[in-house]
Amino acid sequence: MTEIVDITAREILDSRGNPTVEVDVILEDGAMGRAAVPSGASTGAHEAVEKRDGDKARYLGKGVRQAVDAVNGEIYDALSGSDAEDQRRIDRMLIELDGTPNKSRLGANAILGVSLATAKAAASSSALPLYKYVGGVSARILPVPMMNIINGGAHADNPIDIQEFMILPTGAETFSEALRMGAEIFHALKKQLKDAGHNTNVGDEGGFAPNIGSAEEALAFIVKAGEGAGYRCGEDFHLGLDVASTEFFKNGKYVMEGEGKTVDPAGMVEYLAGLVSKFPIVTIEDGCAEDDFDGWKILTERLGGKVQLVGDDLFVTNPERLAVGIEKGLANSILVKVNQIGTLSETLDAVDMAHRNSYTAVMSHRSGETEDSTIADLSVATNCGQIKTGSLARSDRTAKYNQLLRIEEELGDQAIYAGRRALRAL
């Protein structure tokens, strides 16, 4: 009854107005799963490759008809009749069918759409929500949201070098309370920025993109906004950064144009250590560039004992890259983006490897998102305790938060909000 009888892909739009792939998988018993694939703005060189058409006369070359055709043709032919409940076999077949190390022939966007839609169809057939289907009875930890409320870098048109400034409502008792805290701080920040003469337009991930030049000024605005909303920074909520430093790593130096600094890896670490000494920052993502292993080693030795150091471009959700990082002692956490690796099974393997080696894991969106809320379920299914899915504006971001509210409600007394326990710094 869980045999795949139909697979249909289509081209839809993501939150940036760019095409992406959506896939429907239908089973013999009529159950259906649907998944839409996200896309990143700042992408790691080692990510699985999303397939774009390259036809400049159509969607400026960003169309995904080739990926759609691959799903509706070659992938459908290979998977038709397969058991949707055997996720690992499905994913293995997809990987072997593609035949490349980075999924570039069929496209990670084609492969991931099918992988996730298959899992959702199997969950529907089992009459289970996705988080329970994937995670089983132990899936009951609601994640701490990392809310990106000031945007810079590749996510905004302002001079701020650091890509994301985040709040983490660590002091909340429940996820719903954490979401309320975040929303109240978000609105307090909007008022303070407006009062200071800054624009309050939002960036790709729903955060504000004010025309300020320094990280310290951005962090000070957030601390003040939290106080204005009635919350204590360092007690009720903490701060986080996504430096996205690969974006400004040039010829062995970190060129921070907004800050007016050019530093070597050791200097970059000292710059971040200075911010940590001044503000209650508990998590830093991509503090060094993806292939700057020496910088990562210095950073981990300097701050790894008191700050969560998250590898995004460093690990690209790839168990092989993560294994290298673990061996070399780089970072202490992995950012998990399903489209960086391209299948559900490989995503789960990355989280499992992280947990077995005492690394934390953070489930994450991309800057180009859709209304698909799969990652909300996966954050609970994997008990990773943290989710990064943008600010408190734009429905492509709030869709994930709202799904987590539903999951918390469904779990009832069994629900556990991760809170401070999710972070090694606390």
Swiss-Prot record:
Please give an example of a GO cellular component term from this record.
phosphopyruvate hydratase complex
Q: How is the cofactor bound?
A: Binds a second Mg(2+) ion via substrate during catalysis.
Q: Which reaction does it catalyse?
A: (2R)-2-phosphoglycerate = phosphoenolpyruvate + H2O
Q: Which cofactor does it need?
A: Mg(2+)
Sorted UniProt keywords: Cytoplasm, Glycolysis, Lyase, Magnesium, Metal-binding, Secreted
Quote the pathway field: Carbohydrate degradation; glycolysis; pyruvate from D-glyceraldehyde 3-phosphate: step 4/5
UniProt cross-references to InterPro entries, sorted A to Z: Enolase, Enolase-like_C_sf, Enolase-like_N, Enolase_C, Enolase_CS, Enolase_N
Q: Which SMART domains match?
A: Enolase_C, Enolase_N
Check the record and name the PROSITE patterns matching this protein. Answer: ENOLASE (PS00164)
| Residues that, per the record, bind Mg(2+) | 242, 285, 312
Which GO biological process categories is it annotated with?
Answer: glycolytic process
Predominant subcellular localization, coarse grouping: cytoplasm
Where does the record say this protein resides?
Answer: Cytoplasm; Secreted; Cell surface
This entry's Enzyme Commission designation comes to 4.2.1.11
Gene3D superfamilies according to UniProt: Enolase-like C-terminal domain, Enolase-like, N-terminal domain
Active site at which residues? 205 (proton donor), 337 (proton acceptor)
Q: What class of enzyme is it?
A: lyase
* List of residues binding (2R)-2-phosphoglycerate: 163, 337, 366-367, 388
* Highest taxon of the lineage: Bacteria
The record's comment on protein family reads: Belongs to the enolase family.
Primary role: Catalyzes the reversible conversion of 2-phosphoglycerate (2-PG) into phosphoenolpyruvate (PEP). It is essential for the degradation of carbohydrates via glycolysis.
The name this protein goes by in its record: Enolase
